[in-house]
Protein backbone atom coordinates (compact mmCIF):
# COMPACT_ATOMS: atom_id res chain seq x y z
CA UNK A 1 0.00 0.00 0.00
CA UNK A 2 1.40 3.33 -1.07
CA UNK A 3 1.63 6.26 1.36
CA UNK A 4 1.01 9.54 -0.44
CA UNK A 5 0.98 13.19 0.52
CA UNK A 6 -0.23 16.53 -0.79
CA UNK A 7 2.57 16.61 -3.37
CA UNK A 8 1.86 13.17 -4.85
CA UNK A 9 -1.95 13.06 -4.50
CA UNK A 10 -2.72 14.49 -7.93
CA UNK A 11 -0.39 12.13 -9.78
CA UNK A 12 -1.23 8.99 -7.79
CA UNK A 13 -4.99 9.54 -7.44
CA UNK A 14 -6.44 12.18 -9.73
CA UNK A 15 -4.41 11.20 -12.81
CA UNK A 16 -4.62 7.44 -12.27
CA UNK A 17 -6.18 5.31 -14.99
CA UNK A 18 -7.06 2.69 -12.36
CA UNK A 19 -9.76 2.88 -9.72
CA UNK A 20 -8.13 4.28 -6.56
CA UNK A 21 -9.14 3.62 -2.95
CA UNK A 22 -7.81 6.38 -0.69
CA UNK A 23 -7.58 5.67 3.03
CA UNK A 24 -7.55 8.88 5.09
CA UNK A 25 -6.10 7.77 8.43
CA UNK A 26 -3.80 8.66 11.35
CA UNK A 27 -1.34 6.48 13.27
CA UNK A 28 -3.05 7.13 16.63
CA UNK A 29 -6.46 5.96 15.32
CA UNK A 30 -7.36 2.47 16.57
CA UNK A 31 -10.04 1.77 13.94
CA UNK A 32 -7.60 2.94 11.24
CA UNK A 33 -5.04 0.38 12.36
CA UNK A 34 -7.76 -2.26 12.54
CA UNK A 35 -8.81 -1.77 8.91
CA UNK A 36 -5.23 -1.64 7.61
CA UNK A 37 -4.85 -5.41 7.07
CA UNK A 38 -8.20 -5.51 5.25
CA UNK A 39 -7.00 -2.81 2.88
CA UNK A 40 -3.78 -4.77 2.27
CA UNK A 41 -5.89 -7.80 1.29
CA UNK A 42 -8.10 -5.71 -1.00
CA UNK A 43 -5.01 -4.23 -2.68
CA UNK A 44 -3.87 -7.76 -3.57
CA UNK A 45 -7.28 -9.13 -4.56
CA UNK A 46 -8.64 -6.37 -6.81
CA UNK A 47 -7.49 -4.48 -9.88
CA UNK A 48 -7.27 -1.13 -8.15
CA UNK A 49 -4.73 1.09 -6.44
CA UNK A 50 -4.93 1.47 -2.64
CA UNK A 51 -3.19 4.46 -1.09
CA UNK A 52 -3.04 6.02 2.36
CA UNK A 53 -3.06 9.68 3.35
CA UNK A 54 -1.98 10.51 6.91
CA UNK A 55 -4.39 13.29 7.92
CA UNK A 56 -2.03 14.61 10.60
CA UNK A 57 0.73 15.14 8.04
CA UNK A 58 -1.59 16.32 5.25
CA UNK A 59 -4.21 18.59 6.86
CA UNK A 60 -4.89 20.52 3.65
CA UNK A 61 -6.00 17.36 1.83
CA UNK A 62 -8.14 16.33 4.79
CA UNK A 63 -9.80 19.74 4.86
CA UNK A 64 -10.28 19.86 1.08
CA UNK A 65 -12.09 16.51 1.09
CA UNK A 66 -14.10 17.33 4.22
CA UNK A 67 -12.64 14.60 6.41
CA UNK A 68 -14.41 14.81 9.77
CA UNK A 69 -13.73 11.33 11.13
CA UNK A 70 -11.23 8.62 10.34
CA UNK A 71 -10.86 6.21 8.81
CA UNK A 72 -12.57 7.68 5.78
CA UNK A 73 -12.20 5.71 2.55
CA UNK A 74 -12.82 7.39 -0.78
CA UNK A 75 -13.00 5.81 -4.21
CA UNK A 76 -11.76 7.81 -7.18
CA UNK A 77 -12.40 6.85 -10.80
CA UNK A 78 -10.73 8.83 -13.59
CA UNK A 79 -9.93 11.65 -11.18
CA UNK A 80 -13.43 11.97 -9.75
CA UNK A 81 -14.56 10.94 -6.29
CA UNK A 82 -17.32 8.37 -6.83
CA UNK A 83 -17.95 7.00 -3.34
CA UNK A 84 -17.10 7.39 0.34
CA UNK A 85 -17.13 4.92 3.23
CA UNK A 86 -16.69 6.25 6.76
CA UNK A 87 -15.46 4.08 9.60
CA UNK A 88 -13.86 0.68 10.00
CA UNK A 89 -16.45 -1.31 8.09
CA UNK A 90 -16.35 -5.05 7.36
CA UNK A 91 -14.45 -6.24 4.30
CA UNK A 92 -17.70 -7.38 2.67
CA UNK A 93 -19.02 -3.80 2.63
CA UNK A 94 -15.81 -2.51 1.05
CA UNK A 95 -15.93 -5.25 -1.58
CA UNK A 96 -19.55 -4.43 -2.41
CA UNK A 97 -18.68 -0.73 -2.77
CA UNK A 98 -15.59 -1.41 -4.92
CA UNK A 99 -17.44 -3.82 -7.21
CA UNK A 100 -19.89 -1.06 -8.18
CA UNK A 101 -17.05 0.77 -9.96
CA UNK A 102 -14.88 -1.99 -11.45
From Swiss-Prot:
Keyword annotations of the record: Chloroplast, Disulfide bond, Electron transport, Plastid, Redox-active center, Transport
Pfam families: Thioredoxin
Entry-linked InterPro entries: Thioredoxin, Thioredoxin-like_sf, Thioredoxin_CS, Thioredoxin_domain
GO molecular function, one term: protein-disulfide reductase activity
Site (Contributes to redox potential value): 30-31
A GO-annotated cellular component: chloroplast
Boundaries of every Thioredoxin domain copy: 2-102
Residues the UniProt record annotates as site (Deprotonates C-terminal active site Cys): 23
Coiled-coil ranges (or none): none
Localization per record: Plastid, Chloroplast
Residues annotated as catalytic: 29 (nucleophile), 32 (nucleophile)
Signal peptide: none
TM region(s), chain numbering: none
Keyword Ribonucleoprotein on entry: no
Disulfide bonds: 29-32
Gene3D superfamilies per the UniProt record, alphabetical: Glutaredoxin
Family to which this protein belongs: Belongs to the thioredoxin family.
Function in brief: Participates in various redox reactions through the reversible oxidation of its active center dithiol to a disulfide and catalyzes dithiol-disulfide exchange reactions.
Name of protein: Thioredoxin
Amino acid sequence: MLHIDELTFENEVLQSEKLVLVDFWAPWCGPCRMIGPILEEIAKEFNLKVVQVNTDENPNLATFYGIRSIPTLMLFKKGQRVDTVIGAVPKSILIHTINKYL
